[in-house]
Structures are given as C-alpha cells and as structure tokens.
Amino acid sequence: MAATQGASDVLSIGKVDFLKLQNGSDIRGVAIAGVEGEPVNLTELVAEAIAAAFAAWLLNKKKADGLRRLRISVGHDSRISAHKLQNAVTHGITAVGHDVLQFGLASTPAMFNSTLTEDAIHHCPADGGIMITASHLPYNRNGFKFFTSDGGLNKTDIKDILERASRIYEESARCGKQEQTGVVTHVDYMSIYASDLVQAVRKSAGNKEKPLEGLHIVVDAGNGAGGFFVDKVLKPLGAVTDGSQFLEPDGLFPNHIPNPEDKAAMEAITQAVLNNKADLGIIFDTDVDRSAAVDSSGRELNRNRLIALMSAIVLEEHPGTTVVTDSVTSDGLTVFIEKKLGGKHHRFKRGYKNVIDEAIRLNSTGEESHLAMETSGHGALKENHWLDDGAYMMVKLLNKLAGARTLNPNIGSKVLTDLAEGLEEAAVTVEIRLKIDQNHADLKGGSFRDYGESILKHLESVISKDPNLHKAPKNHEGVRVSGYGGWFLLRLSLHDPVLPLNIEVILSSLFFQLSNLRKHQSIKTKLTIMSYVHAGTKQG
C-alpha cells in the first residue's frame, strides 16, 4: 500500500520547488511521464510530503497537541495516476501517526461532505479531506484539493502547506522514510453521499418514493467520477436512464474531455438526449464539482443560461437575494436577475473560490446572498455550506422538476427551460487568450503583470475618447466595456502571462461593427484590442 522508495531515492531527485505546484487554492502538477516538455514534478515522494504537511497544518488549525490523532479522508477521480498518489498520500499521513479513511473513487464535493457527516459506523466526520484530482486537465496531470468542515482551503493555506511540505521533504532526504503508525480504513462513502442527494429530491416532492418515475434522464460522466449519479441517485428516484454514456472511469478520457465548457462534451450529451428522446441530459466534469444540463429539445443549459435558471430557483426561495458571479457573465444576465427576477447581480472575479468567498463576505456585511456561480459550471449555495457541488446543483433542478410533477405528472424539462425565459442571449461569444511575450523589448526587464496592467490603463484611456464605448462604472477585474450592441472584458490572468479577452454581442451583424474599431492602437502591443475582436470573427 505504501510507496516503497527509500531515502536514497529522495536524494537522487534533488531540489523540488514546491511553490510551483500551487494553482490558486489547489495543487496541480505532472504525475505521469511521456508528454514532451512536461517533466514529472508530482512524484509519490512529493505527494507524501504534501500529505504530511496537510496533517501538520490541520493539527495546528485545530490547536491540538501532538498526541491528537487526526482522521483524514482521501478520495480520487479516475486519473491513471490516482492509485499511486492515493497510496503515497496515505503513507504520508499514517507515517506521522494519523489515520486515513480511504474512499477510493469519489467526487470532490463528497470529500468536503465527509467532514460534516455524523456517522460513527463510517468513521465520520473526518477532521479533514484530500481529493486527488486535476479536474479536466490532460491525463498526465494530477493534483490535490483540501477540505475542513469550514470548506475548501484558500491560497494562503495552500502556500503554508507547500512550505511545510518542502521542509518535510528535505528532512526525509536526510533521515529516510518513517514507519506507518496510523490506521487505514476503507469506507464506501459515496453511497452515503448519494443517499443524501436522493433524500433531498424525495423531500421536495412530498416524500414520494419515486418522484422521477416516467422521466427519461441521460447522464454523461465523461469517464470521470460522476457515473454513480445514474445507479445511486437517478434509478432509486424512478428515472429511466437508458442511453447514459461514459459512466465507466477511464483516466485517459477516450471519448471527450470531461468538461461542461468543452464544445465536444456538450455536443456529446446533446446528441445523447436527442438520440434517446430523453427528457433531460446531465453532464459532469471529472470530479463532479461542475455540471451542466440539456433539455428535451437539445437546448444547452450551461454558462449564462444555467446561472439564470439557478437564479430563478434560488430567488423564488429567497426573494431579493444577491447572486454572485464571475466577471465574464453577460449584460443580459444582469437584466434578467435584476429586472425580471427582482434580485441583485454582483459580478465579481474569475475563480470559483473568489466567487464563493465574495458571497460569504457579502453575507458577513449583512447583504444576503444564497448563490455563487461561475460560467464554468461551478455553483455553490448557502444552504449547502457554500460547496461548489455539480451533483447538488443538478439535484436543485431535479427538485424543481419533481415538485412540478406532483401537480402535473406529464410535465417534462420544459418547466426548467421556462424558468430562463426572457434571458437575452448573445449571438456571438468569443474568448481570445492574448499571450504576453516576456522577452519583448517593451517589458524592459519588468514583470508581465506590470506590463499587463499598463495595457489595461492604456485601454481605459482609449475608451474614454470614444463616445460609443462605456466603461463599466463598477468592475472588480480588468476593464469591461459596453457599446456597439455588445461588451468586452480585457483582464490579466491570475497566474499566467496572458490577457484573456471576452467578447459578446447580441446580433452577429454588430460583431463586425465592433470589430471595425481597429483605429484604436495600443502603443504597448503594436496590435489593437479591436483587431483581436476581428480575429475572433474568424474563430467563431
């Protein structure tokens, strides 16, 4: 079960820059060799050190003395490096005297739930949880997400853990590996988690045993960890699930990228709905913290449309509440939430943790918020401990469907589609990622971040001279501009030397009007923001 490398193996690897493994509030790295230019940096020994560091961090957070024995849950998605990293993480924790609950194949939301569940038979609650996943990234990548009963860890926590891991790693190189003293217990936690989802739907339908009976729902798990939703959630609720696809875990992801934002993935679930004449289609990402849906006509319920749908459900339950979203949501969504639903739209930054933390902050100031969502498919609700849970979000849709069917047994997914009726949607949506050449003379030895900020300031100057363009008066990220029947947002990536440019227009003909603004030159880039818009017309 434990990794078998000795101290000499550690010494042969040399120095490891642990901080380079940080990806915001997650850890990401290359775990499998074979891709040119991508050397392995998430080895079993590195994983052991990170796991031991998390245990030390957790012990400190709980203000427990060194004699306290922690219980940490460990789960993984379908990646081909999952088992070796699970064993390494297990050894890292048990070698420092703490116990491990091994869940095996699991979803990210389930790992957080395990810190809340009161179930002595299944050894819960856990003091903390580790999910081994790299979301929708290629097969050679992997990583970790960490949880306590307070939710997912933040960037500062991750930095602390990686600094601890670096010291532990160096110490193990000098002293060799420690013997395992903690206890490992295998737990079927996904059955507990799925049972909670089933009970939530039954409750919404007046405790009817099979509230989805007669409905045909297909699921696309993308060969990730979401296949459980068919046998453990939908079938017990009475749904027909024939035509569901890619439910078997396969870390090579042979059919499509398990990502609700991916065009091929959405086409796959749409085709499954149409081919099987299903009432509803559901698609998950690899670790089930994101999701999207498709109605019976093949209409995609994702991005702005899914946020509109969830907003309608939540605002019906909590009138006037604030909906927090990421920065690239549409102007039409703002109008829909505020004018049609009577809520408040608070557009914030990209990054699911940023959006969730902002909703939590608003509540702490007295501004009620019950929903935080990203266009990527991350969605978190106050009622669900602010966990971004793709399965729970789909359960909210099923609750609405099941509740409506108690009044009209023949009703289908149109009841969901109708909730987003009136949302003004873009004819053209484009994202172009503009890379900053860090060797360009214009940088003059400075950082890409300083250079990117100077481009944003220059853009503001350009916008102020055009009466047809209007900068958003309140914006938390980048420069957002409306005009010519659409809007665009230019922002600086959180981690990479990239300026993502998002553009939306209501009518495709107006896209070309917007693209004709190429006269506005950017001194810094020698290109124009609007010529990128023009380039986008060729891509779209």
Which residues make up each language-model segment?
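N-terminal small/polar loop signature for handling phosphorylated ligands or for N-terminal nucleophile
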Residues: A56, N60-R141, K232-V294, I360
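Buried hydrophobic positions in well-ordered alpha/beta secondary-structure cores of metabolic enzymes
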Residues: D26, V74, M111, I130, ...
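Phosphate-binding and adjacent anionic-ligand microenvironments
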Residues: L280, H318-N502, L507-G540
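An N-terminal, well-structured beta->alpha segment
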Residues: M1-H91, A95, H122-H123, V183-E213, ...
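Eukaryotic N-terminal low-complexity, Ser/Thr- and Lys/Arg-rich leader segments
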Residues: M1-K20, V35-E38, D65-G66, S172, ...
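Conserved phosphate/anionic-ligand binding catalytic regions in large, soluble enzymes, centered on
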Residues: L19-E36, A221, L371-T375, N384-G390
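Proline/glycine-rich low-complexity loops and linkers
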Residues: T94, F103-T108, K159-S195, Q199, ...
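Gly/Ser/Thr-enriched, mixed-charge loops and adjacent short helices
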Residues: G14, H122-H123, N140-N276
